[in-house]
Design a protein with these regions (language model features):
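Periplasmic/extracellular loop-to-transmembrane helix junction in inner-membrane transport proteins
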Residues: 1-15
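Cytoplasmic-entry segments and transmembrane alpha-helices of multi-pass inner-membrane transporters
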Residues: 26-58, 74, 84-88, 92, ...
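Generic alpha-helical transmembrane segments of integral inner-membrane proteins
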Residues: 13, 17-25, 29, 75, ...
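Alpha-helical membrane-protein architecture signal
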Residues: 2, 36-39, 68, 72-75, ...
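C-terminal transmembrane helix and the adjacent membrane-cytosol boundary/short C-terminal tail
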Residues: 34, 91, 167-203
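Short cytoplasmic-facing helical segments at TM-TM junctions of multi-pass membrane proteins
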Residues: 85-124
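Glycine-rich helix-loop "coupling/hinge" segments at transmembrane-helix boundaries
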Residues: 61, 138-167, 171-173, 198-202
């Protein structure tokens, strides 16, 4: 049980970390693209409506079965909420603050690092939080292509008509999702600038 729980968490963590590293820079880049950004976000929204099992099945002809295609599929899925929230969060930064940054001689990179990302951090973290919780649930389907994790118990239970196996897989997944949601909620609170915290508290 402990091994399967760790395996499940490992698959989810690798996928979401890779998703963050890919989606945040891409989201920032899209805010610099006057043309095409809306189309990309629209495609992302459409892809997110596809069944996760279909995405997993899509990677089988490309990468075979096992942990690698499972992580690849989960990585692909993890990018979507993070990319959308990064794009939305950066666009939501007050333009007057950016003009002020230019006025004091900030480079484009300094504006991103010191102004845009800190102010967009709560929205980006909300995307990471959503993505992480989704992935913990979706990772149960990794068992379908030999990726392991707690989904193994669920699939065994379904195949053998043994509800205790289903419970043995479903309960830890629920606990993991709740724990990750709590921890990322605390992180989201910490990365929120004090000024934004005051606005939220007042509302």
């Amino acid at each position: 049980m402990l091994y399967k729980t760790w395996e499940h968490l490992y698959i989810s963590l690798i996928a979401v970390m890779a998703g963050i590293l890919a989606a945040v820079p891409l989201g920032v880049l899209l805010t610099r693209m006057k043309r095409g950004a809306g189309a990309v976000i629209g495609i992302v929204n459409i892809i997110q409506t596809l069944p996760s099992l279909a995405i997993l099945a899509f990677f089988i002809p490309l990468l075979g079965v096992g942990k690698i295609p499972a992580v690849a599929a989960l990585f692909f899925y993890s990018m979507l909420p993070i990319l959308r929230n990064t794009y939305t969060g950066i666009l939501g930064v007050n333009r007057h603050l950016l003009e002020s940054g230019k006025g004091i001689g900030m480079t484009a990179w300094e504006q991103i690092r010191l102004v845009e990302l800190p102010l967009a951090a709560p929205v980006i973290m909300a995307g990471i939080r959503t993505s992480s919780i989704y992935l913990i649930g979706w990772a149960t389907l990794a068992s379908f292509i030999g990726g392991g994790g707690l989904g193994d118990y669920i699939f065994i239970g379904l195949n053998l008509y043994q509800p205790e196996y289903i419970i043995a897989g479903a309960v830890p997944v629920t606990v993991l999702a709740a724990a990750v949601d709590y921890m990322l909620g605390m992180t989201e609170r910490k990365v929120t600038p004090d000024g934004l915290k005051s606005i939220k508290d007042a509302s």
